[in-house]
Amino acid sequence: MIPLPATTKIWLACGATDMRKGFDGLAVLVQQSLKQSPHSGALFAFRGRRGDLIKLLWYDGQGLCLFSKRMDRGRFVWPVTATEAVHLTPAQLSMLLEGIDWRRPERTFPTGLGQPSLAG
């Protein structure tokens, strides 16, 4: 993933998006549906109906960037909500792009088993 500035806001456009849309079509969705400017510096994420394709639209200060990722297996976890957009943190975006359920991340090891032993 291209490193984003720490101040970048990240928005998921809820619902399914027509993945045939490119720069202009997604920019119009940002303006009309999300009521934001595609040139604000925020990153906007869109998911297709099948759930295996995601597109990210981001203005880097020089122009619009459009990134896409298609999962070979599985689907991207997407919110089911009546709102038009959901805010994510950079860590949640990283989990989303890796196919991890960013809403309820879980540890892969048990907790509460005491302190690790010291080497030596």
Enumerate the language-model features and the residues they cover.
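Polybasic/polar functional segments that serve as interface/processing modules
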Residues: 1-120
